[in-house]
Amino acid sequence: MASSAHSDSASADASAEIPAEILAPAPWSTPADDSEHLRITAVRTFLTAPQGCPYVIVRVETNQPGLYGLGCASDPQRTLAIRSVVDDYYAPMLLGRDPSDIEDLHRLLFNSGYWRGGSIGQNALAGVDVALWDIKGKVAGLPLHQLLGGRAREAADAYTHVDGDNAGEIAEKVLAAHERGYRHVRVQVSVPGTDTYGTAPRDAAEARRRELRAGSWDSLAYLRHVPPVLREIRERVGTGVELLHDAHERLTPSQARELVHEVEDARLFFLEDALAPEDAAHFDQLRAAGSVPLAVGELYHDVMMYLPLLQRQVIDFARIRIPTLGGLTPTRKLVAAVELFGARTAPHGPGDVSPVGMAANLGLDLSSPAFGVQEAATFREATREVFPGTPVPERGRFHGTGLPGLGVDFDEAAARKYPVPEPLRHDRWALLRNGDGSVQRP
């Protein structure tokens, strides 16, 4: 098994002494030997899997005793590559620098690779960036949402997930979630004979088939089966609860248009990822196909990918994943654009985003007028042990803790109890194929 903490990395060793000279320091920087000025003394990465999927946690340490920041750099499919970028490339550039110059450091690291962007570099950058915001909040004695402008709302509405085989079963789960306080519920429907996203396996045999990706995907079966079930769920639960559905980028543009037309009467709060990023040019046609609110973006790795869609007003919700977008520094600018173009945010927050990442989401949720709804993972007891202060919704809403910075800590000793598997094979979930044997998007 792989070690859960990678603190013996080259970055940690190299941080034993702050370099006498900082490579290309900012012109306003104080001398590196000024011991009274706040400095970055170490950048450490940790791997842990208390939720079942691998987390990459970044800790930026300073020369002020006890002052450090945490960031989430988690992409379950490229865990080791992300850790390497932080340890081998970003950490040496950060040693000795002032952690308060977040914008400058973000641009420095982003441009350092020359061939910029992509999920690996962006997740690594996000881990550092969010940790710097955490430090800034702790120095100021303010929670993240106060650094970002202060509260725009008392609490952030969350949505939870339910699934099932039929409308009756799913409707019961929706109403049960509503009883627990959730006003927004994502509903996923099992399609007989096909490997359906977002639904639990019926038995151990099906679970094993899914693990090996021995099943296949059938878009036509999905289109025949799911819309009438969604319409019936709406009839059963009434209009007092919002319903969401995720197509998970598995449809062609023409199939997506058909889906939009067929689910009109289900009155969805939003339909997520009806189109893959590669098919974004078709959103104009999708918008014309019906009035169903459209959400997209969890796969986007650059905030500029949203801009044409916002400008053309063809999406209603930006599904933001802070780690994949490079951290809070670019994401807060995207959130401002979302507001200006009249859309709303719906940040990504399932189990592959750590509690550190969720706390970063909440900083934006509580401070932005453009906030729509926050996806909410059910964090395990083990996860809450590793991350003291893990955000947990109360009656379907996140309130924030009011603690300085992110308000979440990291227990290194507890993290070691939940190592990531070795070798990592988390990307096997994406080995989905169509009935004819061709590769299908996950």
From Swiss-Prot:
The record marks P350 as: Important for activity and substrate specificity. The keyword Lyase applies. The active site is at Y197, H248. Substrate binds at H161, E298, R319, H348, D352, E375. Its EC number is 4.2.1.-, 4.2.1.8. PROSITE patterns: MR_MLE_1 (PS00908). Binds 1 Mg(2+) ion per subunit. Its cofactor is Mg(2+). It holds the Pfam family MR_MLE_N. One of its GO terms (biological process) is carbohydrate catabolic process. Mg(2+) binds at D246, E272, E298. SUPFAM superfamilies: Enolase C-terminal domain-like (SSF51604), Enolase N-terminal domain-like (SSF54826). Gene3D superfamilies: Enolase-like C-terminal domain (3.20.20.120), Enolase-like, N-terminal domain (3.30.390.10). GO terms for molecular function: magnesium ion binding; mannonate dehydratase activity. It catalyses: D-mannonate = 2-dehydro-3-deoxy-D-gluconate + H2O. Keywords: Lyase, Magnesium, Metal-binding. PANTHER family: D-GALACTONATE DEHYDRATASE-RELATED (PTHR48080), STARVATION-SENSING PROTEIN RSPA (PTHR48080:SF6). Has low D-mannonate dehydratase activity (in vitro), suggesting that this is not a physiological substrate and that it has no significant role in D-mannonate degradation in vivo. Has no detectable activity with a panel of 70 other acid sugars (in vitro). Belongs to the mandelate racemase/muconate lactonizing enzyme family. GalD subfamily. This is D-galactonate dehydratase family member SSLG_02014. It comes from Streptomyces sp. (strain SPB78).
